[in-house]
Amino acid sequence: SWDDKNMLLSNDTPINIPPYLPQNSVAEYDLRKVYSRVISLDQWIGEKLKALEDDGLLEETIVVFYSDHGGPLPRQKRLLYDSGLKVPLIIRYPNKQRAEKRDDRLVSFVDFPPTLLSMAGIAPPTYMQGLAFEGKYKSKVDRKYIHGHADRFDESVDMIRAVRDKRFKYLKNFNPEKPYYLPLDFRRRLPSMQELLRMRDAGELDANQALWFRQSKAEEELFDTEKDPHELNNIADDPQYKNLLLAMRQECDRWMKQIDDKGLIDEKELIASFYPNRKVKQTKAPNIKINDLDVAVEVITPGSRLGFRYTSEKNPHYGWTHYKQPISSRPDDTLEIIAHRIGYKAVTHKIYNGAITEVLYPQTRIEYHDVMYSHKRP
């Protein structure tokens, strides 16, 4: 756990708190944890580079470093503001080629596959969406725009599309009747999120913090990221940006058509279309052998995987654990064994005190999503 003893950032180091977060010690503490983890990661990367050097491979290796999304704090990860989209990207070439050079080109994650192939001297296939920005098959043109999308937010659902050039960001909200803030159990565990909710309920949010808690959204948003890096001032209705807004809107429409965007299809229908004749195959029940409280499991369906968990309220086991070897089950506790292959229906066995008490077969994966995840969009 990352408590005070794990902090690697000096308390004397000043912290710049983004204006949409609480301007107090709660957010500062969360940010110190983030920066401490960055320091720890930097040390880990140094160890890997040293290992490559010791093995004589460092100057024969291209190292590409990037994160998987923007910041982890509220109004960052999962959102299409730069705080959620913008990530670090560092490329280390052998023998210090282009060392310490900064590059302001627009790069999208879809550019990574063709670029890595290009770096290896392999021509990217034409079906890849991205542009190679390095290597033998580097694209002759640079990106004018990058694009973003947000749909499912864990247990909450929305539909937002984004277009960004080097300065301006355009957002299209397909569900403007929904609030900006959507409750997510994982995010609610963050102290800064808990503090924002406390401040909201107490009426203590300032104007910048309150923006995220508006109960409906503008259909379109436009931000000047040069003048407004935190994207707090929507200029979509400003007449002087009328032509820019139109160009961004048209680019969003063009991109959605080009990639055959499925966002407007009801999620249940989209999932149903994945399967031949809309029918899902069933993972076969595994072979379960029980000896007193010892449980051994063997898969039957090729390619399927096994997981287990306990359901006792007194000593719960949160989430599934991969089955690797026979389990010594707990007395007077329910052990659940799940067999699942991706794209198939799962089967779950419940075991109590050495006996199988129940076998659960979902009716269809489609109906499961209909109950749990279905949503409609305009």
Language-model region placement:
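Active-site-proximal cap/lid insertion segments
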Residues: 1-113, 117-127, 179, 184-220, ...
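Short coil/turn segments at beta-strand junctions that form active-site/ligand-binding loops
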Residues: 59-61, 143, 304
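Residues embedded in well-ordered beta-strands
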Residues: 86-90, 162, 169-171, 307, ...
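Conserved beta-strand positions that form and line the central face of beta-propeller blades
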Residues: 89, 102, 132, 146, ...
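C-terminal cap/loop subdomain of S1 sulfatases and analogous C-terminal strand-loop tails that border
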Residues: 113, 120-221, 274-288
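Short, compositionally stereotyped local motifs that mark structural "simplifiers"
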Residues: 236, 246-250, 258-378
